[in-house]
């Protein structure tokens, strides 16, 4: 019996994950209170959502926030582990990180 892979997700779980369908203006408004309390927010994006994260950084920069961008290499994990996913051990990918601070 073989099980199909449902979704490939990064094992890196720090910060807020930006997807291609994330509404950027709503995200900025929603995170404004957290940014005022904590002083900084960490966002992350992979693959097709990376241009979306760059656009988010431009919006924050225009509003006068300090931004820093970095990359990290992460391992992608399958939600359902089967024999095939055990054989494909090395599935590495890049994550773009955006830190916004006052």
UniProtKB/Swiss-Prot annotation:
It comes from the Eukaryota. One of its GO terms (molecular function) is nucleic acid binding. It is an enzyme of class 3 (hydrolase). One of its GO terms (cellular component) is nucleolus. Its main location: nucleus. It holds the Pfam family Rpp20. Gene3D superfamilies: Alba-like domain (3.30.110.20). Its EC number is 3.1.26.5. GO terms for biological process: endonucleolytic cleavage in ITS1 to separate SSU-rRNA from 5.8S rRNA and LSU-rRNA from tricistronic rRNA transcript (SSU-rRNA, 5.8S rRNA, LSU-rRNA); intronic box C/D snoRNA processing; tRNA 5'-leader removal; tRNA processing. Belongs to the histone-like Alba family. Component of nuclear RNase P and RNase MRP complexes. Component of ribonuclease P, a protein complex that generates mature tRNA molecules by cleaving their 5'-ends. Also a component of RNase MRP, which cleaves pre-rRNA sequences. This is Ribonucleases P/MRP protein subunit POP7. It comes from Schizosaccharomyces pombe (strain 972 / ATCC 24843).
